[in-house]
Amino acid sequence: MSPDFTISIDEFHSGFRLSESETAVLELQVAKDSDAVRARTMLAGYYFHKFGRSSSSTNKNIGASHVLWFVQNLPDTPFLKLPIYLLTADTPSDEAIQNEWQLLVASECSSTILENAAQYFKPKNPNKSISLIEQAVRLDPTNARLLELLSDLYAYVAAKELETDIYVSKSVSALEAYIYKEENTQRKITAIARLAELARESHNLPLAKQSVALGLELSQAKLESKITIDAIHSLQTTRGLIFLDEGNVSEAVKALESSKKKKKTPVFSSFGPQFALANELLK
């Protein structure tokens, strides 16, 4: 059994809009036919949307039991790439779900299953999550999205580990590889903006400057996109902070003012003297 990608994601999201009475009907359908994939997918979406961030409850337990079914029967289900652990955490099914993923990744499996398992392990064991995505990249080296995910995971671990510079450097390398392979211009610009931030954080100012210049150049043809406008805001902010790092206050003000124009309220909330100075300069 292998669900269609579009149907699975669409049906999962359609579960967000279910009423309690509609949910009851679908639960009856699943009780009569455990292989009612569409009904079960919609139910998983319903419980994830409504109870994913709640504390333990009967409804959350029911939702987690549907997730367990998918891990046991359709571990390549697309919605398992989402942060489903929000629904399964602290439920009776969670240990069984973890055991199922452990068994799956210990045997030969696809890059899709490795990615889904990595999403589950991310909050529990982020280093294991990284290992799984690294394995997925080796299996599917042309998949640009896996490289983006790997970069995000390195950055996630960098925020939690003492050896921050090592993981930031790895995140930069993975993101560079992703940008090289990504063909969608808007996604590429967003990734370049992130690369500029990471390069500056790892004190690689030449790469940060190069990334800012490339991102701003590519963005000229895509100014109508909100996503691109957000990326330009990030690029101009990073550009301003680079100038501050170099002690060039006048150019920093110009860049930060340009960033401010892209958003009604610029966000310079990160810790550090440069961010504090950036806020002071724009008062």
Identify the meaning behind each predicted range.
Residues 26-38, 67-86, 99-112, 138-146, ...:
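Flexible helix-coil transition and linker loops at the boundaries of alpha-helical arrays
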Residues 42, 46-49, 83, 116, ...:
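"A position-specific structural signal for the A-helix of alpha-solenoid helical repeats
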Residues 12-25, 56-65, 87-99, 122-130, ...:
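Helix-turn-helix repeat elements of alpha-solenoid scaffolds
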Residues 59-75, 256-264, 282:
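TPR/TPR-like (Sel1-like) alpha-helical repeat modules
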Residues 1-53, 57-65, 76-79:
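N-terminal leader/linker segments that initiate helical-solenoid repeat arrays
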Residues 168-169, 175, 184-283:
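Alpha-helical protein-protein interaction modules
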